[in-house]
A protein has these predicted regions:
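Catalytic grooves of carbohydrate-active enzymes
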Residues: 4-210, 221-223, 492-569
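C-terminal (or distal) subdomains of carbohydrate-active enzymes
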Residues: 23, 190, 201, 205-637
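Active-site neighborhoods of enzyme catalytic cores
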Residues: 1
Length: 637
């Protein structure tokens, strides 16, 4: 965004450590390294190593470099980056590097089961604590609920611990001789989720007018008006009846059942204003609900699904791949590239023990309807990759641009999946686990010419400059990470296809290689650890075919909708109302967080669009004073 930040790069004379695949020669402040820096004119060279959280030779036995000063350059001082840049460095530079997310080169064990679980658990906790803070803010604002500082802070503490470096790079290592880092992440995120759930439950119990089961209260934790499906947990006994929902104008909304993990939920379409709420009456339906979304087998053996936005055709004879995906809102455009040898939603990877690539298209699949009603239709594709069973689900929702998908693989034994023939050596930068082309991928060959990749990053969207995402050495890493979403778009900005994931992982793409999502790697990993398959693999992902650019189609907001679904609860009889804490002109900004500090409500916003023109924020209420606050809490106005 043009903000300038003075930083310290890796110096040109700072070589990678010979025989290492994880650090540079700066790691130990050796005399040779420091003299190389001094000889090139660097007056106060730094070595970049953060003290670890749990190493046995940590601060209890002295600083990182230890007491043997003969091993490294002296004098050496320990500094924070802020202290170094302000007080020790020259403080200025003539360099003007325009930083990109693709300057961040991470080579973790993407696609392994342990990383999928860890990343998924962290993602759930990240979304949960932010929603909990927002719901707590509503409850304090409207009902005077005490701000649960200790519970919120503890939720953030355990979440931040789960984001620690060692959790992700050595998840199998034992923490203080007990549980592994991955097992500890499960515990840490469990605390965050439990605290978040308790905070939300406390908020909901205060916000609803009274106890009961006749009114549904719905809350929106985003700064955009929403008209979408919401799920409310209801008694199991209700399954014996059909139900309808009424808005404050008395208009009936159809409802549809969904059972997840043994919990009965009723889904209906709710219209809720920005940063606001709406209530609905729920009643038994007097008549059977008519009309369902289409899902039926065709005469040619294919299977067709349809909503008001999409027509989708599956081919059971080719493993249930999607042969056609037409977007009605994009003038009926066909998004599937049937000229590509890879199928759309095909699963394919190199199975080392079988000696070659295996594909879900090699065997026919069974397609069946799991859920069908007036609001959504969901089908299951059951097939095999070699001897291994898989189930893919696809859900189309009326009025919803997002196509929700899931894949579950039931493994037999511990198959090895990835590039073959690469013997692991710790000192060899060449590694089998880097090349995604050999991993089990879900392929999405898309009929888009002159493709350009965009991908989200923390408070940023990156326009990729990569010709492809492929590499096989530690010293040649490319940024192939999908945080929340990746968008493959046409360079003429006519259309695109966005892929969303439920966990941080890697994606694949190249000039002659379609967009694909990493589903599985199994084999040797960092430091020679065997990354095994020891349970079923299950991940969720989603697609949005769209016209125009990611920006025009508000893909960032679509991702936020997926991360923060509407919150709903049952309550007693009440006057049906709706309201909004604040509105932003044109729904221009994203609501990052809402927290109380004393009696002041701090609202953090983010502009994910390129439009930097001023926007009006309108607050509901008479006694409101707003001030702009910097991130370090300085009041600007």
């Amino acid at each position: 965004d043009g903000t300038r930040l003075t930083t310290v790069p890796r110096y040109a004379c700072e070589d990678l450590q010979p025989g290492s695949c994880w650090q540079s020669i700066s790691w130990f402040n050796t005399k040779d390294y420091i003299h190389k820096c001094l000889d090139t004119g660097i007056q106060h060279p730094v070595g970049m190593c953060i003290q670890d959280a749990a190493w046995s030779h940590g601060w209890d036995k002295g600083p990182w470099l230890g007491q043997d000063t003969a091993a490294y350059y002296t004098p050496t001082a320990y500094k924070t980056w802020r202290n170094y840049i302000q007080d020790c460095s020259v403080g200025t530079t003539q360099d003007d590097w325009h930083f990109s997310q693709e300057d961040v080169l991470g080579g973790l064990m993407w696609g392994t089961q342990v990383m999928q679980r860890l990343a998924g658990e962290v993602r759930v906790a990240e979304n949960a604590i932010v929603r909990a803070e927002k719901m707590a803010a509503y409850a304090r604002l409207y009902k005077g609920m005490e701000w649960l500082t200790e519970r919120i802070d503890e939720g953030w503490r355990t979440l931040l611990l789960s984001q620690h470096h060692d959790c992700w790079i050595v998840p199998y290592n034992q923490l203080q001789g007990k549980k592994t880092w991955a097992e500890t992440v499960t515990d840490w995120t469990g605390v965050t989720n439990q605290n978040s759930r308790q905070i939300i439950d406390n908020a909901l119990s205060l916000l609803k007018e009274k106890e009961g089961e006749s009114t549904v209260y719905v809350y929106n934790t985003l700064a955009t008006d929403r008209n979408e499906l919401v799920a409310v947990e209801v008694p199991v006994s209700w399954r014996n009846s059909d139900w309808v929902v009424l808005d404050k104008q008395g208009k009936k909304q159809p409802a549809q059942w969904l059972t997840e993990d043994g919990i009965s939920k009723l889904l209906f379409r709710a219209q809720v204003p920005s940063a606001g709420y709406a209530s609905y009456a729920i009643r038994k339906a007097e008549d059977k609900q008519s009309g369902t979304l289409k899902a039926e087998r065709q005469k040619d053996g294919t299977f067709r699904m349809e909503s008001d936005l999409y027509t989708l055709v599956l081919n059971p004879s080719k493993g249930g791949v999607i042969e056609s995906l037409k977007a009605k809102a994009v003038r009926g455009k066909e998004f599937v590239d049937n000229r590509n040898e890879r199928g759309f939603n095909e699963l394919r990877g190199y199975f080392i023990d079988e000696g070659g690539f295996l594909s879900s298209m090699d065997q026919p699949a069974e397609v069946s309807v799991l859920e069908q009603g007036p609001l959504f239709v969901k089908v299951a594709v059951k097939g095999k990759i070699g001897k291994y069973s898989f189930t893919q689900t696809i859900r189309l929702t009326q009025g919803e641009p997002r196509i929700d998908m899931n894949v579950k693989l039931d493994w037999t034994g511990n198959p090895r999946i990835g590039e073959p023939g690469i013997e692991f050596r710790a000192d060899n930068p060449r590694k089998a686990f880097y090349d995604d082309r050999y991993k089990l991928l879900v392929y999405l060959p898309t009929q888009i010419a002159n493709q350009q990749i965009y991908k989200d990053a923390p408070f940023d969207v990156c326009e990729s400059r990569l010709e492809n995402t492929f590499f096989n050495r530690w010293d040649s890493i490319k940024h192939n990470i999908i945080l929340n979403w990746v968008d493959v778009a046409s360079k003429d900005n006519s259309c695109g296809l966005s892929l969303f994931t439920d966990h941080t992982t890697s994606y694949a793409h190249g000039k002659d290689f379609p967009l694909a999502l990493n589903v599985q790697y199994a084999g040797k990993g960092l430091w020679g650890r065997d990354y095994i398959i020891d349970r079923p693999t299950e991940i969720s992902y989603a697609l949005i075919p769209h016209a125009g650019t990611w920006e025009k189609s508000r893909i960032w907001t679509q991702s936020e909708r997926r991360n923060e679904p509407l919150v709903a609860t049952l309550g007693g009889d009440a006057t049906l109302t709706s309201g909004s804490l604040f509105r932003i002109e044109n729904n221009a900004y994203e609501l990052v967080s809402m927290v109380y500090k004393g009696n002041d409500l701090y609202i953090r916003l983010f502009n994910a669009q390129s439009d930097a023109s001023p926007k009006t924020i309108t607050f509901q209420g008479q006694d409101v004073k707003a001030s702009l606050v910097e991130l370090d809490n300085r009041l600007v106005e």
